[in-house]
């Protein structure tokens, strides 16, 4: 079992996370990371003997642990699908600071290769979120293929909205995404709603 982080370690990882979110993995220099943590480079290397990659690995592990606890677990938890997605919307809003925080997975992904140091973990994270969203859509009554399509679209909208927030310097795209997420996963297909309306007026 991994040794629990101390509060000091949690704060250190949080400060490193902000640098990677703002600058990206390749752009983050040791000088930037040291300045953000308030430690000298030698002290950082003492904490992280394998350097920047180890720092990013711990940041990613902490983020994925948070996601498992606050996103994946509620999606599979108790309550109606609507209640669970409402909790997830609230937690996503907090994690991404209402769209002001960039997507860590995107900022750690290598632009040059599909086999970067974090590629496997990032892929698993996306697949886990798609699977969790898909299960919720299935529980709401959608067919497997429809549920998968809704889940993939929801994940695309999540990360696309964060990219737009960063580019536009506005949190509006993320707020629009959060408002639309319950409907993206749970709402009846428009064709079904139209058929019900037609039957009602027959």
Task: Give the positions of each predicted feature.
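N-terminal intrinsically disordered/low-complexity leader segments
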Residues: 1-7, 189-202
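Hydrophobic alpha-helical connector segments
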Residues: 58, 71-100, 139, 144, ...
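Short, basic, alpha-helical segments at the C-terminal edge of helix-turn-helix-like DNA-binding modules
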Residues: 60-66
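Amphipathic alpha-helical packing segments from all-alpha helical-bundle domains
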Residues: 68, 115-140, 149, 179-186
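Amphipathic C-terminal alpha-helical segment
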Residues: 95, 111, 135, 155-173, ...
């Amino acid at each position: 079992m991994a040794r629990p982080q101390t509060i000091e370690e949690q704060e250190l990882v949080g400060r490193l996370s902000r640098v990677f979110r703002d600058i990206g993995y390749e752009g983050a220099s040791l000088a930037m990371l040291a300045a953000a943590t308030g430690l000298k480079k030698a002290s950082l290397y003492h904490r992280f003997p394998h350097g920047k990659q180890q720092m990013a690995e711990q940041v990613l592990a902490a983020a994925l642990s948070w996601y498992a606890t606050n996103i994946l677990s509620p999606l599979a938890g108790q309550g109606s699908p609507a209640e669970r997605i409402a909790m997830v919307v609230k937690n996503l809003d907090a994690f991404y600071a209402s769209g002001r925080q960039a997507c860590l997975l995107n900022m750690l992904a290598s632009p040059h290769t599909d086999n970067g140091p974090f590629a496997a973990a990032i892929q698993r994270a996306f697949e886990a979120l798609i699977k969790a969203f898909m299960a919720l859509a299935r529980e709401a009554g959608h067919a497997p293929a429809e549920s998968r399509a809704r889940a993939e679209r929801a994940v695309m909208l999540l990360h696309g909205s964060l990219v737009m927030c960063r580019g536009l310097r506005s949190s509006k795209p993320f707020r629009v995404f959060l408002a639309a997420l319950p409907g993206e996963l749970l709402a009846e297909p428009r064709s079904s709603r139209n058929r019900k309306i037609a039957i009602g007026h027959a």
